[in-house]
């Protein structure tokens, strides 16, 4: 695997896919990002096993296909620390990923891409498509009553229900006796 990309084209997608990764992952591979180069595109994937985020970056310079995983935080910090407009050259050599930009050189340990959890194997029972503005409006109208740090973890989310052509978002309201 080998690719070159401009810092600005890589930084925002890196930040987005690093979002789901917690500070102390339960498995070492969950602290890594999956990098895949194929068909002129770099795909970056991060997961915490509950949520997966994928970002894609178009590669305009010559590249070689391949896949690996790298420590997310280290890779992001390296890219963020480089000057604006810097070109970042990345090359996989054995179990190390070499990152070069200008006179800077970094070597990151990798884990095999085959070990990265694949949430694509999960099959949904229901699929639906709706405009982003409609989805945003539904969430905003419901999220005010969502718990954020309740020990009853099932209250820390939103329920999406479908019935026929109807999508319903709901939250559970628990009445607790006052003393």
Report each predicted region and the residues it spans.
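Hydrophobic heptad-repeat coiled-coil signature
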Residues: 177-179
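Structural preference for solvent-exposed beta-strand-turn elements
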Residues: 1-175
């Amino acid at each position: 695997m080998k690719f070159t990309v401009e810092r600005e084209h890589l930084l925002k997608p890196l930040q987005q896919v690093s979002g789901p990764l917690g500070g102390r992952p339960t498995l070492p591979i969950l602290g890594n990002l999956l990098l895949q180069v194929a068909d002129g595109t770099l795909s970056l994937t991060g997961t915490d096993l509950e949520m997966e985020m994928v970002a894609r970056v178009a590669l305009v310079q010559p590249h070689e296909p391949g896949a690996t995983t790298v420590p997310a935080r280290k890779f992001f910090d390296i890219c963020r620390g480089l000057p604006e407009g810097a070109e970042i050259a990345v090359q996989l050599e054995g179990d190390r990923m070499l990152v070069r930009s200008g006179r800077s050189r970094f070597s990151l340990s990798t884990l095999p891409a085959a070990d990265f959890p694949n949430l694509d194997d999960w099959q949904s029972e229901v699929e639906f498509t709706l405009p982003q503005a409609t989805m945003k409006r539904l969430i905003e109208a419901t999220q005010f009553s969502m718990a954020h740090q309740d020990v009853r973890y099932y209250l820390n989310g939103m329920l999406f229900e479908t019935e026929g052509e109807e999508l319903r978002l709901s939250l559970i309201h628990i009445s607790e006796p006052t003393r």
